[in-house]
């Protein structure tokens, strides 16, 4: 039995929505990591009052006041993009900045729709942080996103809460739906039809919520359970939102000994995942519609592919190049260092199965998810894997190595 840390995506949204509510909220089981601390601290600087700890936090919203200092987003793209949507709807001036990694990630995709709504932005060349926002009284828009992005969709929807008129977001494919799901449960008029989300401006009262375990964190252990000899792993109290279970769907397509069930609903579906050693994995071409639903987990498919029969192919995943690192390049370069044959595409990769991972040293380039991936690879390698600067896992999963050690011992 394994419990993974609370969900990072939902923690960000719970903090933001509780700060936007009209009355106090009580939040249970929030994830405390470097990314979510940035969201918490920014909301505090804007005037929100927090009491308690991350296991039980009371949130007392206040009207936002213009901050004197620039607001630090650290390494958190979610903080930057979601707070851009919120701040665009307040008639005040704010500046967002981040660490060197975040300052290389593109912000044009969120600036464009928010400027169409009436906010003004000024950013570095090529629309990188730091970024100044002059908020305004916004107008609702109908916007087609160029890529399926839950962060862009959420930024526009959060801005639409205080806009005049209806806000519509249309995506090329479905992305994570935490924001619209939570808003709807809070009584905000939200309609979802396929990849189209329609929101009417609204206010809402405070709420009580328990954050489920993070399926993206559980994914590392679920994959380990499938590829490690004599493994049996059960993950409990984990979020099973259908827009987050893409990896589980792909593992079933590959023939993994895997099952999951929903045991309760609390704004989000929560349940249990069970996995056992899966010696008969088969390579797959990951279906295009699943790619946006597992964007953070796609590199793990390469690890599954090493042990599968036949070819495993990921395409239409160019978004991976715009994460904390260029995850396609970092994956391919480091797998080759470990003796794994892998082919790189502009929008993905291909790996031929039934290989072995010899071992060696890798550099995740400060990317928390890549560091965790290579650590899992080390456990199924011949000689072990040395992961440079592995402390970067604290961005999303501070006790990853402690939990990994427990799993290996048991």
From Swiss-Prot:
Catalytic residues in the record: 296 (proton acceptor)
InterPro entries (alphabetical): Enolpyruvate_Tfrase_dom (IPR001986), Enolpyruvate_Tfrase_sf (IPR036968), EPSP_synthase (IPR006264), EPSP_synthase_CS (IPR023193), RNA3'P_cycl/enolpyr_Trfase_a/b (IPR013792)
SUPFAM superfamilies, A to Z: EPT/RTPC-like (SSF55205)
Pathway: Metabolic intermediate biosynthesis; chorismate biosynthesis; chorismate from D-erythrose 4-phosphate and phosphoenolpyruvate: step 6/7
GO molecular function, one term: 3-phosphoshikimate 1-carboxyvinyltransferase activity
Main location: cytoplasm
Any Gene Ontology biological process: aromatic amino acid family biosynthetic process
Record-listed E.C. numbers: 2.5.1.19
Binding site for 3-phosphoshikimate: 8-9, 13, 149, 151, 296, 323
UniProt catalytic activity: 3-phosphoshikimate + phosphoenolpyruvate = 5-O-(1-carboxyvinyl)-3-phosphoshikimate + phosphate
Subcellular location, record wording: Cytoplasm
GO cellular component: cytoplasm
Quaternary structure (record): Monomer.
Family the UniProt entry places it in: Belongs to the EPSP synthase family.
Task performed by this protein: Catalyzes the transfer of the enolpyruvyl moiety of phosphoenolpyruvate (PEP) to the 5-hydroxyl of shikimate-3-phosphate (S3P) to produce enolpyruvyl shikimate-3-phosphate and inorganic phosphate.
Protein name: 3-phosphoshikimate 1-carboxyvinyltransferase
Source organism (scientific name): Thermotoga maritima (strain ATCC 43589 / DSM 3109 / JCM 10099 / NBRC 100826 / MSB8)
């Amino acid at each position: 039995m394994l419990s993974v840390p609370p969900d990072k995506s939902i923690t960000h949204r719970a903090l933001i929505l509780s700060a936007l509510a009209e009355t106090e909220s009580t939040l249970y089981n929030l994830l405390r990591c470097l990314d979510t601390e940035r969201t918490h601290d920014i909301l505090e600087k804007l005037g929100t009052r927090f009491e308690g700890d991350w296991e039980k936090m009371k949130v007392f919203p206040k009207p936002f006041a213009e901050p004197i200092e620039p607001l630090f987003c650290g390494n958190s793209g979610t903080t930057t993009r979601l707070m851009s949507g919120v701040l665009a709807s307040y008639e005040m001036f704010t500046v967002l900045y981040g660490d060197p990694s975040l300052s290389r990630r593109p912000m044009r995709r969120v600036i464009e729709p928010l400027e169409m709504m009436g906010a003004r932005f000024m950013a570095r060349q090529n629309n990188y942080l730091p970024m100044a926002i002059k908020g305004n009284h916004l107008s609702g828009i109908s916007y087609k996103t160029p890529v399926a992005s839950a962060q862009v969709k959420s930024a526009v929807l959060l801005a639409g809460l205080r806009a005049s008129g209806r806000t519509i977001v249309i995506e090329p494919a479905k992305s994570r739906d935490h924001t619209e799901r939570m808003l709807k449960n809070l009584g905000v008029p939200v309609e979802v039809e396929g990849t189209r989300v329609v929101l009417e401006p609204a206010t809402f009262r405070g709420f009580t919520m328990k954050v489920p375990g993070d399926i993206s964190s559980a994914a590392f252990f679920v994959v380990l359970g499938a590829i490690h000899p004599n493994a049996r792993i059960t993950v409990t109290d984990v979020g099973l939102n259908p827009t987050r279970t893409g990896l589980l769907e792909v593992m079933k397509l590959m023939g993994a000994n895997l099952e999951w069930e929903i045991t309760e609903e609390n704004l989000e579906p929560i349940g249990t995942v069970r996995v056992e050693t899966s010696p008969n994995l088969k390579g797959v071409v990951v279906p295009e519609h699943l790619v946006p639903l597992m964007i953070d987990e796609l590199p793990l498919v390469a690890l599954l592919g090493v042990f599968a029969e036949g070819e495993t192919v990921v395409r239409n995943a160019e978004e991976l190049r715009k994460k904390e690192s260029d995850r396609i390049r970092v994956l391919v370069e480091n797998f080759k260092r470990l003796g794994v044959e892998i082919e790189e595409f502009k929008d993905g990769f291909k790996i031929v199965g039934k290989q072995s991972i010899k071992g060696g040293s890798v550099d995740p380039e400060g990317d928390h998810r890549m560091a965790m991936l290579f650590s899992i690879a080390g456990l199924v390698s011949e000689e072990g894997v040395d992961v440079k600067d592995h402390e970067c896992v604290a961005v999303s999963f501070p006790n990853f190595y402690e939990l990994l050690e427990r799993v290996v011992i048991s």
